Design a protein with these regions (language model features):
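Hydrophobic alpha-helical transmembrane segments of multi-pass integral membrane proteins
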Residues: 24-29
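Pore domain of cation channels
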Residues: 30-33, 41-106
Length: 346
């Protein structure tokens, strides 16, 4: 028993290449040997190979078996050797698989996908809700979460966790930030507002300099807590700044004056409601905002803004610029028709 245990330990310590080479050699040579020992029973190489494979991987079918003493002795060797070879291979594959799962859970595996969204930071409810809403959207397929936690705080097939400091280029490389669609920076939890915004600013400037290094513009959205810190972020070239605490204050104040308005806002922001806010590009046949407004309205949607300019409703005859980013309110089916260039029947 001790002999077989030591033999198994030695085989397990073999390099993968050595083990594969040894296994292939065993399966190649064994049929030749059994053919030499019992040429009548194993008249072809294929019959010998079939017997070796069945003997080492199953209990045997009994269609081919050695009948002479030398054949039986060799058969015994094949059984034990095959048992250790197959057992070692299975053990090594299992070990690699368990190691892969552990590395993925601990955020030590690099992400090599493209067109993903990167979320930096973690807080239980806020970011969980954000991820839920993003994954409910058809345009979001994969999310990479960067945080300094011992293991992934969320288990989902579309979420890849990276453990590391977001202010280090190595971490951004591992998350493949250069080929992401956008980076979302959440304010750190449990930190006073003046320090939290400082950390967010440091991350934002790191992403900006990283983008210059890889020669790509990285679309960045940052959550900040204090309005008087807005000016500090101008130099960081953050594409969108969200005042999280103030947004809630505005919503509550508006709801108290215009009762029921909060439900309207929440429905437009949630991916679970029927009508949502979408972004579309300008069509060639749309010259003025009125052209776009009328066609979009006829299809059952509503044009509300170009970028952050909501005054276009009062300027219907203004020519739409080529770089227009038109925001509409529509259900999913209507949005698909508009974005795919659906033509209205006259």
């Amino acid at each position: 028993m001790l002999f077989w245990r030591k033999a198994f330990e030695k085989m397990f310590k073999m390099s993968n290449i050595t083990l594969i080479y040894f296994t292939l050699s065993f399966f190649f040579i064994s049929p030749i040997i059994i053919h030499i020992l019992e040429p009548e029973k194993f008249s072809t190489y294929i019959k010998g190979l079939w017997w070796v494979i069945v003997t080492t991987t199953t209990v045997g079918y009994g269609d081919y078996f050695p009948e002479t003493l030398p054949g039986m002795i060799f058969g015994t060797i094949v059984i034990f050797t095959g048992l250790f070879l197959i057992g070692t291979l299975v053990a090594k594959v299992s070990e690699r698989f368990i190691k892969w799962i552990k590395m993925k859970e601990e955020g030590k595996m690099d992400y090599r996908g493209e067109d993903h969204y990167v979320i930096i930071g973690w807080s239980d409810d806020k970011i969980k809700d954000t991820i839920k809403e993003m994954l409910n959207s058809d345009s979001v397929h994969n999310i990479v979460l960067i945080a300094d936690l011992p293991s992934s705080p969320i288990d989902h097939s579309q979420i890849h966790y990276i453990q590391g400091e977001p202010t280090e280029y190595e971490t951004l490389d591992r998350a493949n930030v250069a080929k992401s669609k956008a980076v979302i920076i959440f304010s750190p939890q449990g930190v006073p507002a003046k320090y939290a915004d400082g950390q967010t600013l440091l991350i934002a400037t790191t992403i900006e300099s990283y983008g210059e290094k890889v020669n790509r513009h990285i679309y960045t959205i940052a959550e900040i807590l204090k309005e008087n810190h807005l000016m500090n972020f101008k130099h960081a070239k953050v594409d969108e700044l969200i005042l999280s605490q103030q947004s809630i204050s505005y919503l509550i104040a508006h709801a108290s004056v215009h009762k029921g308005s909060s439900k309207l806002f929440m429905n437009l922001l949630s991916t679970e409601s029927g009508e949502k806010i979408y972004v579309i590009n300008k069509k060639k046949e749309w010259i003025t905002y009125n052209d776009a407004f009328e066609e979009i309205k006829a299809m059952g949607a509503l044009l509300i803004a170009d970028h952050d300019d909501t005054s276009i409703i009062r300027r219907p005859n203004t020519i739409i610029p080529e770089q227009a980013k038109l925001f509409i309110i529509a259900d999913e089916n209507t949005f698909q028709k508009i974005s795919e260039g659906y033509v209205i029947n006259s």
